[in-house]
């Protein structure tokens, strides 16, 4: 938030803005590295929504204001993290709730932004499908809406996914059957995070 505010008034206080942005670019890398190597996170899909939302705000603000995100958006784990919430959704879109996540159907507008940014049809296609199924929309959907993949075939996505460091595996029998079978398992230490 403070970084985006600094960008808004950068022409008036360039030295202070520069210091704020340098520190922000350095410090945001730590939470972004938590998605390494394959996009999985130690906390649940609700926290992915929260964390990725503010990452996307920051990256988008840098790109739109300065023409670069200084390589932050190319961090492999973050780039692939759009799969995390998707894969943790059951065929009826209910989330696998671990680590204080909500038990609800979930999809977020960040999928539109990530779909455009990383040219990933499945990110935008999943969000488009979730909105059609009644998942709550928000103002960011208007800002980042991407209908290029509205006809994306969800069944082209893998049915199973293993997030290595986060020790989460998901399995399903299909993507488009709202009553289909799906399961997710979380391994790891009970002393980690929540």
Model-based region annotation:
Residues 1-46, 143-157:
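Active-site lining segments of carbohydrate-active enzymes
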Residues 42-194:
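Extended polysaccharide-engagement surfaces of secreted carbohydrate-active enzymes
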């Amino acid at each position: 938030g403070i970084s985006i505010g600094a960008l808004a008034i950068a022409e008036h206080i360039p030295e202070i803005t520069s210091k704020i942005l340098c520190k922000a670019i350095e410090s945001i890398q730590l939470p972004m590295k938590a998605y390494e190597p394959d996009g999985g996170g130690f906390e649940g899909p609700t926290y992915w929504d929260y964390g990725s939302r503010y990452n996307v705000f920051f990256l988008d603000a840098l790109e739109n204001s300065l023409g670069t995100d200084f390589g932050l958006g190319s961090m492999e784990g973050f780039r692939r993290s759009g799969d995390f919430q998707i894969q943790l959704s059951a065929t009826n879109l209910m989330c696998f709730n671990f680590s204080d996540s909500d038990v609800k159907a979930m999809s977020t507008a960040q999928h539109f932004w990530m779909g455009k940014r990383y040219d990933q049809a499945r990110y935008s296609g999943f969000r488009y499908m979730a909105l059609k199924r009644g998942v709550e929309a928000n103002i960011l959907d208007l800002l980042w809406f991407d209908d290029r993949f509205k006809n994306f075939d969800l069944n082209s996505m893998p049915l199973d996914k293993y997030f290595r460091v986060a020790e989460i595996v998901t399995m399903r029998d299909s993507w488009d059957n709202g009553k289909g079978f799906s399961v997710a398992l979380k391994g790891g230490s009970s002393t980690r995070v929540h």
